[in-house]
Curated annotation (Swiss-Prot):
Zinc finger NR C4-type: from-to: 566-586, 602-626
Region (AF2), start-end ranges: 686-932
NR LBD domain residues: 678-912
Family: Belongs to the nuclear hormone receptor family.
Gene: PGR
Species this protein is from: Hylobates lar (Lar gibbon)
Protein name (record): Progesterone receptor
Region (Modulating, Pro-Rich): 1-565
C-alpha cells in the first residue's frame, strides 16, 4: 500500500483547476502519530471530533445482525484512520501556509474540499465486498445548516451517498480515480444538490484519460431558479449527454434485482433502461409511500420522470415522426432520443437523453439489431412508446411489466391501462385552437420501426374494432365511430408544417370518395388529391368505418375480376373471343374448324382430356368443348349489333308516305325523313337500354355427331336451361328499376318466371332465325319436325311451337319483344304479395308504358295502337297456361331423373324442388291483363 505524506507546503486547491494528487491521497495512506499540529484553533476541534462518529454509520454502514465481529472491527478502524488522515492533511495544508487563523470562508471552502475528498472512491478496495446497508441511526447532518433549507434533498443525499462511498474502485495505478475525486463545489450550489448516479468505476473528467464507457450517464440537477450543476468541463447542455464513468453505468445496469451495490439496489435489471436517460430533477414535497422503506422512496423520487407542461400537439406530431421515420438522423433539431430495449446487447453503451418527452415512458416490444445503436452515432430507431392513454384491450393482452410512473409518489405498477396523470401546473391557454389535443400513439407503432412511414396513419386508418382507450385530461372528445378503437384530433390541432404532416403518416389531402352521414369518407392511404381539385380538410376525421363496410355498399361494390384462364384448355387467356374467355390457340382453332366445315371424329369415347398439353390430340373433343362453352362465330358481330340498332326501313306498301305525327304519339317517338322512301325513327332511351343489356347467344353443348336419344336431348336441354337461368339472373340485375326491389322479391320473381322467359326466348329465336319453322333452342340444338317426333316429348314440342307461330302471325318487333320480356318477369307474384309491392307496381306500370311507346313506333293512330296492345297482352296471358304444362313435365322428369338417366344441374334442381310444387299447387298469383 502506497503511503504518501505531506511534509512540504502545498498550494490550496482552486475550484475548477487541475486536481491535486496530494489532497486526493489521504484515503490511500495510514495516518501517522503526532500529525495534528498543536496550533489548531479551538472552534474546529469539536467539529473534527464529530466527524468520525457520524461518518462511521453513514459512509460505512454498520453490519447487520449475524455479521462477523472481526470484520466490523476492521472496518471501524479503517474508516476512522482514513478520516483522521484526511483531516491531518487538511490541517497540514493550513499550517504550511504560514497562517493559523484563516478567514471563515476559506475554512468552509477547505472543509468542503475535505468532504469532497471523503466522497472520492477508494482505490484499493476493489476486491473487498461491500457490507450490506443497514439502518442509519445517526442524526448528524453532513452539510450542517444547509440541509434544513432544502428538506427533500436530505433523504435523497443519504440514499445516494452510501453506494457512492462503498463502490469498488478501478486499478491501483489509475490516476483518474483519485484525481477526479478532488473537486470543490461551485459557488452558489449546495452540496446536497450535486448528485451522481451510482457508479462502480472512476469518473472521467476533462483532466483525466477517458476510456470508452459502456453506459455513459448524466444527471442534470436544476435549482429552483433554473441554474444547472457544473463540473470541470462546463455545464450540462440539453440534448448533449456527457460521460460520467467508465464501467460505472455498466456495472449499475448489470446489478440483478436484490443485489447490493453499496447496500442499495437503485434500479432493477429489468428497469435498467431508466439509468441511462439524462433527467431533470424537480423538487416534490410529498410524503413517503406507505409500505416502502425511506431509502426506496428516496431512490424512486430521485430517478422518476416528472410531468412537465408541454405543447401536447407538438408532442403528438414529434412522437409520430420519431416512431415512423426510419431515416431520421436526430441532428440539432432532434427533440428527444430513445433508450434501448432491455436485455439488448447494446443496452450498456447508448447515451440517451429525455428532453421534451418526459411524460410517460414505456418499454419497447422488439429488440433492434446489435449495431443499431452506435455510441454517439446517428439517431437510433424508435424503441420507446410515448403516449398519455393506452388501449385497454392491448394492455390486458400483454404480460405485466413494472414501470416507473411519474407522480408525487412514484411506484412500480404493472402494464395495465393508466389512469389520468396528476394535475399539471397552471399554464397559459393554447395559442391555436386544438393545441391541447393529444393523439395516443398505437401500441404497435414501435413494433414496426423498420416499416414504411405510411404505416401509422396506415394502421389508424385500417384496424379492427377494439376497446376504446381511457380518456386522459388532454384527450380529444370521445366519438362513437364504428370500427375504430380511437379517434383522431381535428386537422387544425396539429402543427401546420410539412414535417408534421409527413410525420403523422397521412396524405397531404384526401378526396371524398364515399359519404357516411354526410361526411367525407376517408379513402385508401395511397389515394392522394389529384391536381386541380380543392383540398379537403373535414372537421371530423374521427368518423371512420372499416374498409369492409365501405365496400359492402351495393352501389359502389366492385366484384373481383375472374382469373384469366382459358375455358377450353386452361392456358392463360388472351381475351374474350367469340363470346368466351379463351386463349389465342383455341380462338384460331375454333375459327378454322367452323369456317372449314371439318367433320372431326373422336377416336375414343368423346371424353378426351383437353388441356394445355393435350389440346391438339383430339380436335373433335376440342371443338365439342368450344361449343359447350358457348363459342360462336357471330357472337362478336351480334353483340355489336345489339348495342346500336335502328328501325328497319319499311316498305312503301306497309307504311304510307310520311305524314304528320299524331299528337298522342308525339311524346313516344320522333320521325326524321332522310329520303322520300325511307323513314328512320329514334328509339326511346329505355328501350335502347334494354337492347344493350340483351344476353349474348348461349350454346347447349349438344353433340350432334351422335344419334339423338331421349336422355341425351333432355340432358342437353337441362344444361341449356342452367346457362339460361344464369343469364336471366345477370340480365335482371342490369334491368333498370329491378334492383330497387327487396332482395327477397328479386329472387322470388326470378324463380317464378324463369320458365316463361326461356320459352319466350325460344319462340323469339325460332321466329327470327328460322321463321318459326323449327324450334331454335341454341345454335347447336335445333329441332325440326322430324327430330321432334323422334323425341319422347313431342307433345311438349308442339305446345312450345305455338309461340314462334304467334310471333310470325303478329310480326312482333324487337322493341315490343323486349318490353314484353320484362313484363313476363313481373307477371307472377306470391299470393300474399311482395315486400316492396309499391315499387313493384310502379316498375310494372312504367314498362307497360314502354310497351305502348314501342307499339307507337309502327302503329299510326289510337285505334290501331289499342288493337296492337290487346293482341300482345293477350299473348302474355296465354303463356301462363302453356308454361304450366312445362312446369308439370319438368317436375315429373325431375322426380324420375334416375330412371330416365337425365341429369339436372344444381341450380336448376334447387329451383325445381323449391318453387314448382308451389306454382302447380296454385300458391302464386298470375297478373293477367284480361279476364278469362
Amino acid at each position: 500500500m502506497t503511503e504518501l505524506k505531506a511534509k512540504g507546503p502545498r498550494a490550496p486547491h482552486v475550484a475548477g483547476g487541475p486536481p491535486s494528487p496530494e489532497v486526493g491521497s489521504p484515503l490511500l495512506c495510514r495516518p501517522a502519530a503526532g500529525q495534528f499540529p498543536g496550533s489548531q484553533t479551538s472552534d474546529t476541534l469539536p467539529e473534527v471530533s464529530a466527524i468520525p462518529i457520524s461518518l462511521d454509520g453513514l459512509l460505512f454502514p454498520r453490519p447487520c445482525q449475524g455479521q462477523d465481529p472481526s470484520y466490523e472491527k476492521t472496518q471501524d478502524q479503517q474508516s476512522l484512520s482514513d478520516v483522521e488522515g484526511a483531516y491531518s492533511r487538511a490541517e497540514a495544508t493550513r499550517g504550511a501556509g504560514g497562517s493559523s487563523s484563516s478567514p471563515p470562508e476559506k475554512e468552509s471552502g477547505l472543509l468542503d474540499s475535505v468532504l469532497d475528498t471523503l466522497l472520492a472512491p477508494s482505490g484499493p478496495r476493489q476486491s473487498q465486498p461491500s457490507p450490506p446497508a443497514c439502518e442509519v441511526t445517526s442524526s448528524w447532518s453532513l452539510f450542517g445548516p444547509e440541509l434544513p433549507e432544502d428538506p427533500p434533498a436530505a433523504p435523497a443525499t443519504q440514499g445516494v451517498l452510501s453506494p457512492l462511498m462503498s463502490r469498488s474502485g478501478g486499478k491501483a495505478g489509475d490516476s483518474s480515480g483519485t484525481a477526479a475525486a478532488h473537486k470543490v463545489l461551485p459557488q452558489g450550489l449546495s452540496p446536497s444538490r450535486q448528485l451522481l448516479l451510482p457508479a462502480s468505476g472512476s469518473p472521467h473528467w476533462s483532466g483525466a484519460p477517458v476510456k470508452p464507457s459502456p453506459q455513459p450517464a448524466a444527471v442534470e440537477v436544476e435549482e429552483e431558479d433554473g441554474s444547472e450543476s457544473e463540473d470541470s468541463a462546463g455545464p450540462l447542455l440539453k440534448g448533449k449527454p456527457r460521460a460520467l464513468g467508465g464501467a460505472a453505468a455498466g456495472g449499475a445496469a448489470a446489478v440483478p434485482p436484490g443485489a447490493a451495490a453499496g447496500g442499495v439496489a437503485l434500479v432493477p435489471k429489468e428497469d435498467s433502461r431508466f439509468s441511462a436517460p439524462r433527467v431533470a430533477l424537480v423538487e416534490q414535497d410529498a410524503p413517503m409511500a406507505p409500505g416502502r422503506s425511506p431509502l426506496a422512496t428516496t431512490v424512486m423520487d430521485f430517478i422518476h420522470v416528472p410531468i412537465l407542461p408541454l405543447n401536447h400537439a407538438l408532442l403528438a406530431a414529434r412522437t409520430r415522426q420519431l416512431l415512423e421515420d426510419e431515416n431520421y438522423d436526430g441532428g440539432a433539431g432532434a427533440a428527444s432520443a430513445f433508450a434501448p430495449p432491455r436485455s439488448s446487447p447494446s443496452a450498456s453503451s447508448t447515451p440517451v437523453a429525455v428532453g421534451d418527452f418526459p411524460d410517460c415512458a414505456y418499454p419497447p416490444d422488439v429488440e433492434p439489431k446489435d449495431d443499431a445503436y452506435p455510441l454517439y452515432g446517428d439517431f437510433q430507431p424508435p424503441a420507446l412508446k410515448i403516449k398519455e392513454e393506452e388501449e385497454g384491450a392491448e394492455a390486458s393482452a400483454r404480460t405485466p411489466r413494472s414501470y416507473l410512473v411519474a407522480g408525487a409518489n412514484p411506484a412500480a405498477f404493472p402494464d395495465f391501462p393508466l389512469g389520468p396523470p396528476p394535475p399539471l401546473p397552471p399554464r397559459a391557454p393554447p395559442s391555436r385552437p386544438g393545441e391541447a389535443a393529444v393523439t395516443a400513439a398505437p401500441a404497435s407503432a414501435s413494433v414496426s420501426s423498420a416499416s414504411s412511414s405510411g404505416s401509422t396513419l396506415e394502421c389508424i386508418l385500417y384496424k379492427a374494432e377494439g376497446a376504446p382507450p381511457q380518456q386522459g385530461p388532454f384527450a380529444p372528445p370521445p366519438s362513437k365511430a364504428p370500427g375504430a378503437g380511437g379517434c383522431l384530433p381535428p386537422r387544425d390541432g396539429l402543427p401546420s408544417t410539412a414535417a408534421s404532416a409527413s410525420a403523422a403518416g397521412a396524405a397531404p389531402a384526401l378526396y371524398p370518395a364515399l359519404r357516411l352521414n354526410g361526411l367525407p369518407q376517408l379513402g385508401y392511404q395511397a389515394a392522394v388529391l389529384k391536381e386541380g381539385l380543392p383540398q379537403v380538410y373535414p372537421p371530423y376525421l374521427n368518423y371512420l368505418r372499416p374498409d369492409s363496410e365501405a365496400s359492402q355498399s351495393p352501389q359502389y361494390s366492385f366484384e373481383s375480376l375472374p382469373q384469366k384462364i382459358c375455358l377450353i384448355c386452361g392456358d392463360e387467356a388472351s381475351g374474350c373471343h367469340y363470346g368466351v374467355l379463351t386463349c389465342g390457340s383455341c380462338k384460331v382453332f375454333f375459327k378454322r374448324a367452323m369456317e372449314g366445315q371439318h367433320n372431326y371424329l373422336c377416336a375414343g369415347r368423346n371424353d378426351c382430356i383437353v388441356d394445355k398439353i393435350r389440346r391438339k390430340n383430339c380436335p373433335a373433343c376440342r371443338l365439342r368443348k368450344c361449343c359447350q362453352a358457348g363459342m360462336v362465330l357471330g357472337g362478336r358481330k351480334f353483340k355489336k349489333f345489339n348495342k346500336v340498332r335502328v328501325v328497319r326501313a319499311l316498305d312503301a306498301v306497309a307504311l304510307p308516305q310520311p305524314v304528320g305525327i299524331p299528337n298522342e304519339s308525339q311524346v313516344l317517338s320522333q320521325r326524321i325523313t332522310f329520303s322520300p322512301g325511307q323513314d328512320i325513327q329514334l328509339i326511346p332511351p329505355l328501350i335502347n337500354l334494354l337492347m344493350s343489356i340483351e344476353p349474348d347467344v348461349i350454346y347447349a353443348g349438344h353433340d350432334n355427331t351422335k344419334p339423338d336419344t331421349s336422355s341425351s336431348l333432355l340432358t342437353s336441354l337441362n344444361q341449356l336451361g342452367e346457362r339460361q337461368l344464369l343469364s336471366v339472373v345477370k340480365w335482371s340485375k342490369s334491368l333498370p328499376g329491378f334492383r330497387n326491389l327487396h332482395i327477397d322479391d328479386q329472387i322470388t320473381l326470378i324463380q317464378y318466371s324463369w320458365m316463361s322467359l326461356m320459352v319466350f326466348g325460344l319462340g323469339w329465336r325460332s321466329y327470327k332465325h328460322v321463321s318459326g319453322q323449327m324450334l331454335y333452342f341454341a345454335p347447336d340444338l335445333i329441332l325440326n319436325e322430324q327430330r321432334m317426333k323422334e323425341s319422347s316429348f313431342y307433345s311438349l314440342c308442339l305446345t312450345m311451337w305455338q309461340i314462334p307461330q304467334e310471333f310470325v302471325k303478329l310480326q312482333v318487333s324487337q322493341e315490343e319483344f323486349l318490353c314484353m320480356k320484362v313484363l313476363l318477369l313481373l307477371n307472377t307474384i306470391p299470393l300474399e304479395g311482395l315486400r316492396s309491392q309499391t315499387q313493384f307496381e310502379e316498375m310494372r306500370a312504367s314498362y307497360i308504358r314502354e310497351l305502348i311507346k314501342a307499339i307507337g313506333l309502327r302503329q299510326k293512330g289510337v285505334v290501331s295502337s289499342s288493337q296492337r296492345f290487346y293482341q300482345l297482352t293477350k299473348l302474355l296471358d296465354n303463356l301462363h297456361d302453356l308454361v304450366k304444362q312445362l312446369h308439370l313435365y319438368c317436375l315429373n322428369t325431375f322426380i324420375q331423373s334416375r330412371a330416365l338417366s337425365v341429369e339436372f344441374p344444381e341450380m336448376m334442381s334447387e329451383v325445381i324442388a323449391a318453387q314448382l310444387p308451389k306454382i302447380l299447387a296454385g300458391m302464386v298469383k298470375p297478373l293477367l291483363f284480361h279476364k278469362k
